[in-house]
């Protein structure tokens, strides 16, 4: 059984808006609805859990689930930190779950190739992150001074989904809470217990929408986007 947790319990702070950025519309459709739609249409995904703020539950049900006729969507409440929200989502998953994908609700341009490849590799390697090679030269800076310039060919920008064997990610989260450890993404928790993580090529279009500038880029992506309907219909054995 393949499940996805979509994290949508953030805010619109960097957008300078009073509403959750997930509810901002792209082409008359909310960002979170775009994101859910991709996983909803993917034949390999058996279960969808969306993490939202408790106070936004009624709005989410009326304006997303009911409006777009999504069926069997589970809801988990957001926590203080992103990690807490995901842990709440993990507790909502069916116990028959084999592989779980964890995805940012504000990344609506994830495609079926990424989803399917993540599941396929996770079945063999247990832990998978999607990402892209960085195009800029990265500097490590301390107190305004450049301390080091890492080799660019070794650097990747991590994206989501991040995909894990169910028992592994549960163990990683339980160990993290036991040791009061908070990571900036889920793969850090898995790395923290000694599990290697495999990188799968993501997409430069798989952006996270967090600023007004990102919204402009998202509109441009929509203008040229073509959904890969064929890949969405290929069930992974």
UniProtKB/Swiss-Prot annotation:
Tell me the GO BP annotations in alphabetical order.
isopentenyl diphosphate biosynthetic process, methylerythritol 4-phosphate pathway
Q: Which reaction does it catalyse?
A: 2-C-methyl-D-erythritol 4-phosphate + CTP + H(+) = 4-CDP-2-C-methyl-D-erythritol + diphosphate
Give me the gene this protein comes from: ispD
CDD domains reported in the protein's UniProt record: CDP-ME_synthetase
Keyword RNA-binding among UniProt keywords = no
Q: What is this protein called?
A: 2-C-methyl-D-erythritol 4-phosphate cytidylyltransferase
Concerning InterPro entries, the annotation shows: IspD, IspD/TarI, IspD/TarI_cytidylyltransf_bact, ISPD_synthase_CS, Nucleotide-diphossugar_trans
- Annotated site location: Positions MEP for the nucleophilic attack: 152, 208
Q: Does the keyword Transferase apply?
A: yes
Q: Annotated Gene Ontology MF terms?
A: 2-C-methyl-D-erythritol 4-phosphate cytidylyltransferase activity
Q: Which cysteine residues pair off into disulfide bonds?
A: none
What EC class is this? transferase
- Native source species: Clostridioides difficile (strain 630) (Peptoclostridium difficile)
Question: Which pathway does it operate in?
Answer: Isoprenoid biosynthesis; isopentenyl diphosphate biosynthesis via DXP pathway; isopentenyl diphosphate from 1-deoxy-D-xylulose 5-phosphate: step 2/6
Which keywords describe this protein according to UniProt?
Isoprene biosynthesis, Nucleotidyltransferase, Transferase
Give the site residues for Transition state stabilizer: 14, 21
Q: What is its EC number?
A: 2.7.7.60
